[in-house]
């Protein structure tokens, strides 16, 4: 569970209830400068330079310094990757002939290799992304392993049915792989989003062309090496680093791609959907932005609600699509909640992500850094009350002070738009009917949460809120077994759980004439 991560970096009395075996286990000391082994394009189980020979820098967000140059894939490289994937998916190929149980064993093997290299991958993730190393190790890598192993178990268990149709006929269904799956992953959880995409696609027998985020390409590329080591046939997984308008657009519009799965902003999701529809009507799964309401009722456990609301917003430097970024607090506990939330934000440790005491590292890059500061300025200009933070937290790197706004109104920019940073907005409400209307008055619908001791209130709100996930008295609790996805402009389709397999299969009906049917 994500919430367990907090205990590793901050073990005060109020967090005692969060302690778990994962959080108390020893975390190996990291290498602060892990060597980069993979920075090219991975096609057909081989490493390639870009056709154009272009490269781009990937930057350490803690310092602003370049880590290394990475091959910059574009349309020509995507064409090569799709060609390799289509060859791997041909009838009679080793991948198509492989038993489903063997596909599962390959996924188990991949998870084992990632676990073997867990310390290295966690350090590389922290170097390239900026998230605290203990979070990379205890949370991200733990969830990667659980996701891959969960879908490995599904490989030979997701199947069709026999159907008793009328007449002398025998009818059954097959769950067949869609084919070539384009997958475009974001920079906020590079390894985890790679696992969310690869797990169900490979378990069901598909082949993959993946574009990794230009801000954080290094860990996903290293996993490509492990995919080859695990024994996946050439062409089954191909990984192209590059930029959205070139490599990403080429995947979304490619006639040889049968499905595209994208995690990222709603704005880019629109472009993906249009490109998919105007090309070959490929299937689309979108996990997009959010402005999730976190509702604190007056009867909530105040200690727990304050800590969880802090976690809901500030976890991962606020760079979560499902962040609890609209904190609605019932009026008779509003002042106390605000006071305690400000105190908690002021105590949040911001700094070197390799330091085990650090709770918050830098934002991912300069673009995000400047965008977040712009939202903070907007909040001040529109009349929200800046209660703490509001500026840069270091002389170099992309660190931002934990920021809290009070007296936030629904019409303010910071209450409507996804900030994607460590900026908490606290809003006041009176009645449960009022907060339902205000919480649902958003173009987004990814997640929501309710804190209350009253089960009737919790049940009512969980049904009334327009969100794909509703947490009750907790936040950011994920499991590979539970589906995740959004309502409205937060996306379409579901990832994780059994539901996550549906997007990667076609259901084929086969009907056979028989001489005589007997029950």
UniProtKB/Swiss-Prot annotation:
Keywords: Acetylation, Mitochondrion, NAD, Oxidoreductase, Transit peptide, Ubl conjugation
Any one GO biological process: regulation of dopamine biosynthetic process
Record note on modification: In response to mitochondrial stress, the precursor protein is ubiquitinated by the SIFI complex in the cytoplasm before mitochondrial import, leading to its degradation. Within the SIFI complex, UBR4 initiates ubiquitin chain that are further elongated or branched by KCMF1.
Active-site residues from the entry: 287, 321
Enzyme class: oxidoreductase
Subcellular location: Mitochondrion matrix
InterPro entries: Ald_DH/histidinol_DH, Ald_DH_C, Ald_DH_CS_CYS, Ald_DH_CS_GLU, Ald_DH_N, Aldehyde_DH_dom
Site (Transition state stabilizer): 188
Induction of its expression: By retinoic acid; 3-5 fold increase.
Catalyzed reaction equations: an aldehyde + NAD(+) + H2O = a carboxylate + NADH + 2 H(+)
Residue ranges of the motif SIFI-degron: 12-26
Keyword Transit peptide: yes
Gene3D superfamilies linked: Aldehyde Dehydrogenase, Chain A, domain 1, Aldehyde Dehydrogenase, Chain A, domain 2
Protein family membership: Belongs to the aldehyde dehydrogenase family.
Protein name: Aldehyde dehydrogenase, mitochondrial
């Amino acid at each position: 569970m994500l919430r367990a991560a907090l205990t590793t970096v901050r073990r005060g009395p109020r967090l005692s209830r969060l302690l778990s075996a994962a959080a108390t286990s020893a975390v190996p000391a990291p290498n602060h400068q892990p060597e980069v082994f993979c920075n090219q394009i991975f096609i057909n189980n081989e490493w390639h330079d870009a056709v154009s020979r272009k490269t781009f820098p990937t930057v350490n967000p803690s310092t602003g310094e370049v880590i290394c140059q990475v091959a910059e894939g574009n349309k020509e490289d995507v064409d090569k990757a799709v060609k390799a994937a289509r060859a791997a998916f041909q009838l009679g190929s080793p991948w198509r002939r492989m038993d489903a149980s063997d596909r599962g064993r390959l996924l188990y093997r991949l998870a084992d290799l990632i676990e073997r290299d867990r310390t290295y991958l966690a350090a590389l993730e922290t170097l390239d992304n900026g998230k605290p190393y203990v979070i990379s190790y205890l949370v991200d890598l733990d969830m990667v392993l659980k996701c891959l192993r969960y879908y490995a178990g599904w490989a030979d268990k997701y199947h069709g049915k026999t159907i008793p149709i009328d007449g002398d006929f025998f009818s059954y269904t097959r769950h067949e792989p869609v084919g070539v799956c384009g997958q475009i992953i974001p920079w906020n959880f590079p390894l985890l989003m790679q696992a969310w995409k690869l797990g169900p696609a490979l378990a069901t027998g598909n082949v993959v062309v993946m574009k990794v985020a230009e801000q954080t390409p290094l860990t996903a590329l290293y996993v490509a090496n492990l995919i080859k080591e695990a024994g996946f046939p050439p062409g089954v997984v191909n990984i192209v680093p590059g930029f959205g308008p070139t490599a990403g657009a080429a995947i979304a519009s490619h006639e040889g791609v049968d499905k595209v799965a994208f995690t990222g902003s709603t704005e880019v999701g629109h472009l993906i959907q249009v490109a998919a529809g105007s090309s070959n009507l490929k299937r689309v799964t979108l996990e997009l932005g959010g402005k999730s309401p976190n509702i604190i009722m007056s009867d909530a456990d105040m200690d727990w609600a304050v800590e969880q609301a802090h976690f809901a917003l500030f976890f991962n430097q606020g760079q979560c699509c499902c962040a609890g970024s609209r904190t609605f607090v019932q009026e008779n506990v509003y002042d106390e909640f605000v006071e305690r939330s400000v105190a908690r934000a002021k105590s949040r440790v911001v700094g070197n992500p390799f330091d085990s005491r650090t709770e918050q590292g830098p934002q991912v890059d300069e673009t995000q850094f400047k965008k977040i500061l712009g939202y903070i300025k907007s909040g001040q200009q529109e009349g929200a009350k800046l209660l703490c933070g509001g500026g840069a937290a270091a002389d170099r790197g992309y660190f931002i002070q934990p920021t809290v706004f009070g007296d936030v109104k629904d019409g303010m920019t910071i209450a409507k738009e996804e900030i994607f940073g460590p900026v908490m907005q606290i809003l006041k409400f009176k009645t449960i009917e009022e907060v339902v209307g205000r919480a649902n008055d958003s173009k987004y619908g990814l997640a929501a949460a309710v804190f209350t001791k009253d089960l009737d209130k919790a049940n009512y709100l969980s049904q009334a809120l327009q969100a794909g996930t509703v947490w009750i008295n907790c936040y950011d609790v994920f499991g590979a077994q539970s589906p995740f996805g959004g309502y409205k402009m937060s996306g379409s389709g579901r990832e994780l759980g059994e539901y996550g397999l549906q997007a990667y299969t076609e259901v084929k009906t086969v009907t056979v004439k028989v001489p005589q049917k007997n029950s």
